[in-house]
Design a protein with these regions (language model features):
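Substrate-binding/catalytic subdomain of NAD(P)-dependent oxidoreductase enzymes
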Residues: 179-275, 280-282
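Conserved anion/nucleotide-ligand pocket segment
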Residues: 143-208
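Rossmann-fold NAD(P)-binding glycine/threonine-rich loop
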Residues: 85-91, 104-141
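ATP-dependent carboxylate/acyl-activation modules
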Residues: 273-328, 335-341
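A conserved regulatory-domain signal marking ACT and ACT-like small-molecule sensing domains
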Residues: 313-315, 319-406
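A short hydrophobic/small-residue beta-strand
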Residues: 98-100
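N-terminal glycine-/serine-/threonine-rich beta1-alpha1-beta2 phosphate-ribose binding loop
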Residues: 1-94
Length: 406
């Protein structure tokens, strides 16, 4: 049986998950691919901690010892970070090695360049795990949705924020209370900034947009707002109005343009995304012929993410064994849409905290707040109305949520 040797860069949560799947599912993988997948070497900071515990793998802290090994044909990068990972992946591709990575930050910043290097060296760069964790999202976009013109993508792509918002909604707790519990139980990092401010979701949105439209948008060019200002009052009012609040990463086509943003939305309870609870993720893709499809599952964690990584490795091995040439798993070489910073007309829900909510039109929480609605309005018009609300005596704060209907 043909053997494909793997160099594993990183042996943490995801890296160890890759090892365990390849070990436990060895016979099944060999039957499906016709290839024996063997981790030859693994990059770790302290090799001596692993040498006596795991046999059959050479652990090293010298990345060149792995990248210069001509017998290794596939590099799996699960290091995290950008600069060091970029240098490793770039060198691997230039050396004629296939690469599988779960590194969304790396791909958001350097994905176009790395994809070009992969093309020039006739190797594969696969990264299914970078956006949906265990959810197969990117390959369907490339292989199955490509015959459609994508009209919109809305995604719950961060498990931490979805866990927090679900807990706030179902338990009636504040953001601060739920965040503390999430950190204590390992659902949120000690420094949750990347998650709760929407940065993690923005990196994933960049990758989705690149694959769906061929449009490369920088991180700084995307409007982003996290969940730190969402209150239990907002969630109560949303529920009374037939909605829930979700942090969505979205890209919407409008003619020849696409508009991207990451922010909390009021999502209709009749929409499939409203049913996505706790750490689960889901991505809604709407195509002109296909209509709307929903891809749903575990968005993070050792086994879901490692499963996607192994699936990419198996795909490469199968293609190599059968000498098959498939649709490249890469961005379009030419953009089909142009990025715009002007938001399209949208529906909005506006929460007004005031001691006199009855004086406003909308759904009221007595003596606390009111949720009022605007349909198909521009951001500029909405800002004028919000400014007017803020001048009214008794109004404390005003919060804005775009609306996603079913």
């Amino acid at each position: 049986m043909k053997v494909e040797k793997i160099g594993l860069l990183g042996f943490g949560t995801v890296g160890s998950g890759v090892y365990h799947i390849l070990t436990k599912k060895q016979m099944s993988i060999e039957k499906k691919t016709g290839v024996s997948l063997q981790i030859e070497k693994a990059l770790v900071k302290e090799p001596e901690l692993f040498a006596d515990k795991i046999s059959g793998i050479t652990f090293t802290s010298d990345v060149d010892y792995i990248l210069n090994d001509e017998e290794i044909s596939i590099i799996v990068e699960v290091l995290g970070g950008v600069d060091f990972a970029y240098n490793c992946v770039k060198k691997a591709l230039e050396s004629g090695k296939h690469v599988v990575t779960a590194n969304k930050d790396l791909l958001a910043k350097h994905g176009v360049e790395l994809s070009q290097i992969a093309r020039e060296n006739n190797v594969y760069l696969y990264y299914e795990a970078s956006v949906g964790g265990g959810i197969p999202v990117l390959r369907p976009l490339v292989e199955h949705v490509s015959s459609n013109e994508v009209e919109a993508i809305y995604g719950i792509v961060n498990g931490t924020t979805n866990f927090i918002l679900t807990s706030m909604s179902q338990q009636g707790l504040s953001y601060e209370e739920v965040l503390k519990t999430a950190q204590e139980n390992g659902f949120a990092e000690a420094d949750p900034t990347s998650d709760v401010e929407g940065y993690d979701a923005t990196y994933k949105l960049i990758i989705l947009t690149r694959l769906a439209f061929g449009t490369n948008v920088s991180f700084d060019a995307i409007p982003k707002k996290g969940i730190t200002e969402v209150t239990k009052t907002d969630l109560q009012l949303a529920k009374l109005s037939g909605y829930t609040i979700k942090l969505l990463a979205s890209v919407v086509a409008n003619g020849e343009e696409v508009y991207l943003e990451v922010r909390p939305y009021c999502v209709s309870l009749n929409h499939l995304l409203a049913q996505v609870a706790y750490e689960n993720n889901a991505i809604s893709v709407t195509g002109d012929a296909l209509g709307e499809i929903l891809l749903y599952g575990k968005g993070a964690g050792s086994h879901p993410t490692a499963t996607s990584v192994v699936a990419d490795v198996m795909m490469i091995a199968t293609q190599q064994n059968r000498n098959a040439k498939v649709v490249p798993f890469e961005p379009l070489t030419e953009a089909t849409k142009v990025h715009t910073t002007t938001a399209p007309l949208k529906d909005y829900a506006v929460v007004i905290e005031t001691s006199k909510p009855e004086e406003f039109d909308g759904v009221v929480l007595p003596n606390q707040a009111v949720l009022t609605r605007f349909t198909q309005i521009s951001e500029a018009e909405l800002e004028e109305k919000v400014f007017a609300y803020q001048q009214v005596d008794g109004v404390e704060t005003v919060r804005i949520y775009p609306v996603l209907e079913a």
